[in-house]
């Protein structure tokens, strides 16, 4: 998938990596030096877009400084991206046995008997007081605690309209409203209204995701300081966070929909066990 990063950072005209990128009036992107090679307008006071023939005068041309900075970063990270994004075939050998940690579950979350599935209910659950428990945000952590190595797990999101999954620092403050962002110690992807997918960068990165997404693979590589997300319906890459810190242990993070009817089977999040990955139904006999 790394070729997609390279493709998006190429000049539309010379097809090489963008250098000092500029926008024409119509949105066409090319290198600053490629402007001299574009066809001139009949009047001679502008250039023609090679795609749509819209004329751009000198004052219409905008220097894309932010895009240029992004392209530079992509070029610098390309070796690491190539390494990470070609590991999908071998990720499953790092799959870990994991359950949900009930002692961290916010009291409006129902956890199944097998500790693999979770959904939200308006009815508050009677649980013991725990310093580890989330409040007020509807979140729960996985039982695993990661300090080194490579780890992989799969989460069934089904047709849920709202969810967030990924990893967080173990040291996050669980006793206040959660704001998902890297700077707050969260590396997650999620969806709102079943159509707006995003990664918890700051600001959020909107993602283009297959609408048939039902199961997500998560690969944490503490050697490469990255965590990547994969659409298991077609094996496509969703997003990778790079240069994650390694100063704190990480925990798997789950937050199901909290704004849909109680017991709605579509809103369940489930961890796939190592021996039998698959879709799980609604939790029964909740804890």
Curated annotation (Swiss-Prot):
<dbReference type="InterPro" id="IPR003879">
    <property type="entry name" value="Butyrophylin_SPRY"/>
</dbReference>
<protein>
    <recommendedName>
        <fullName>Ret finger protein-like 4A</fullName>
    </recommendedName>
</protein>
<dbReference type="InterPro" id="IPR022723">
    <property type="entry name" value="RDM_domain_RFPL"/>
</dbReference>
<dbReference type="GO" id="GO:0008270">
    <property type="term" value="F:zinc ion binding"/>
</dbReference>
<keyword id="KW-0539">Nucleus</keyword>
<dbReference type="GO" id="GO:0005737">
    <property type="term" value="C:cytoplasm"/>
</dbReference>
<dbReference type="InterPro" id="IPR001841">
    <property type="entry name" value="Znf_RING"/>
</dbReference>
<dbReference type="InterPro" id="IPR003877">
    <property type="entry name" value="SPRY_dom"/>
</dbReference>
<dbReference type="GO" id="GO:0001674">
    <property type="term" value="C:female germ cell nucleus"/>
</dbReference>
<keyword id="KW-0963">Cytoplasm</keyword>
<comment type="subunit">
    <text>Interacts with PSMB1, UBE2A and CCNB1.</text>
</comment>
<dbReference type="InterPro" id="IPR043136">
    <property type="entry name" value="B30.2/SPRY_sf"/>
</dbReference>
<dbReference type="InterPro" id="IPR050143">
    <property type="entry name" value="TRIM/RBCC"/>
</dbReference>
<feature type="domain" description="B30.2/SPRY">
    <location>
        <begin position="78"/>
        <end position="278"/>
    </location>
</feature>
<dbReference type="InterPro" id="IPR037960">
    <property type="entry name" value="SPRY/PRY_RFPL"/>
</dbReference>
<dbReference type="InterPro" id="IPR006574">
    <property type="entry name" value="PRY"/>
</dbReference>
<dbReference type="Pfam" id="PF13765">
    <property type="entry name" value="PRY"/>
</dbReference>
<keyword id="KW-0862">Zinc</keyword>
<keyword id="KW-0479">Metal-binding</keyword>
<keyword id="KW-0863">Zinc-finger</keyword>
<dbReference type="InterPro" id="IPR013320">
    <property type="entry name" value="ConA-like_dom_sf"/>
</dbReference>
<dbReference type="InterPro" id="IPR001870">
    <property type="entry name" value="B30.2/SPRY"/>
</dbReference>
<dbReference type="Pfam" id="PF00622">
    <property type="entry name" value="SPRY"/>
</dbReference>
<dbReference type="InterPro" id="IPR013083">
    <property type="entry name" value="Znf_RING/FYVE/PHD"/>
</dbReference>
<dbReference type="Pfam" id="PF15227">
    <property type="entry name" value="zf-C3HC4_4"/>
</dbReference>
<dbReference type="Pfam" id="PF11002">
    <property type="entry name" value="RDM"/>
</dbReference>
<feature type="zinc finger region" description="RING-type; degenerate">
    <location>
        <begin position="11"/>
        <end position="53"/>
    </location>
</feature>
């Amino acid at each position: 998938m790394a070729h997609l990063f390279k493709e998006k950072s190429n000049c539309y005209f010379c097809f090489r990596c963008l250098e000092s990128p500029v926008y024409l009036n119509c949105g066409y992107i090319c290198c600053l030096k490629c402007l001299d090679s574009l066809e001139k307008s009949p009047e001679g006071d502008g250039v023609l877009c090679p795609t749509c023939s819209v004329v751009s005068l000198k004052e219409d041309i905008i220097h894309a400084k932010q895009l240029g900075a992004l392209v530079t970063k992509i070029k610098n990270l390309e070796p690491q991206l190539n390494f990470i994004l070609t590991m999908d075939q071998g990720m499953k050998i790092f799959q870990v046995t994991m359950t949900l940690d009930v002692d961290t579950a916010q009291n409006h979350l129902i956890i199944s008997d097998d500790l693999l599935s979770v959904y939200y209910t308006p009815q508050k659950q009677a649980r013991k007081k725990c310093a580890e428990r989330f409040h007020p945000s509807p979140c729960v952590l996985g039982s695993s605690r990661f300090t080194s190595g490579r780890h992989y797990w799969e989460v069934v999101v089904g047709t849920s309209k709202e969810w967030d999954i990924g990893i967080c620092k173990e040291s996050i403050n669980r006793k206040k409203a959660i704001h998902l962002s890297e700077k707050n110690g969260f590396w997650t992807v999620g969806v709102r209204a079943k159509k707006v997918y995003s990664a918890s960068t700051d600001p959020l990165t909107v993602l283009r995701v297959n609408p048939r997404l039902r199961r997500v693979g998560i690969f944490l590589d503490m050697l490469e300081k990255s965590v990547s997300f994969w659409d298991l319906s077609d094996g496509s890459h969703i997003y990778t966070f790079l240069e994650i810190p390694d100063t704190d242990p990480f925990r798997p993070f789950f937050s199901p929909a909290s704004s849909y009817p109680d017991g709605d089977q579509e809103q369940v999040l489930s961890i796939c066990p190592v021996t039998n990955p698959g879709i799980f139904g609604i939790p029964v006999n909740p804890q």
